[in-house]
A protein has these predicted regions:
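N-terminal nucleophile
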Residues: 1-137
Length: 137
């Protein structure tokens, strides 16, 4: 089963947070993003237009990545950053981004499912929050 999972918490600079969708199924792919909320939203909207238009203008400069995105296709997982000319294939069985990404990767290394990994990451990362969202390819 190929899937993408995410937490639901978006945090603002003033200490406020709210639940939102961070992953989206678009035709035969799944996309997700973590980082600056505005740039994540712009990336997800760009994906719904099949990446046909030029990339949106990102908040951060190319030297400082304001967000990272994942693109799950039938042939594998790809990571995208504003400084990349195109998504780069991840040659690993799984990957995770965002503030809870390291915790989630460790959990998956220990055999947890993506959903379980995010639940655990939410317990140790103050910027990650439930519920977990899961989309299957």
């Amino acid at each position: 089963m190929k899937c993408m999972a995410s937490d639901s918490m978006v945090s603002l600079g003033n200490g406020l947070s709210y639940p939102a969708d961070k992953i989206r199924k678009v035709k035969k792919i799944i996309v997700g993003a973590g980082g600056d909320g505005g740039d994540c939203s712009r990336f997800l909207e760009w994906a719904t237009r099949d990446f046909k238009e030029p990339p949106p203008k990102w908040k951060g400069s190319k030297e400082e990545e304001s967000f990272l995105a994942l693109v799950l296709k039938a042939d594998g997982l790809y990571v995208y950053a504003p400084s990349f000319p195109e998504p780069e294939k991840v040659n690993a069985p799984f990957f995770a981004i965002g503030t809870g990404g390291e915790a989630a990767r460790v959990a998956m290394m220990l055999g947890k499912t993506p959903e379980e990994a995010i639940e655990l990451a939410c317990q140790v990362d103050g910027y990650s929050g439930l519920p977990v969202q899961v989309l299957e390819l």
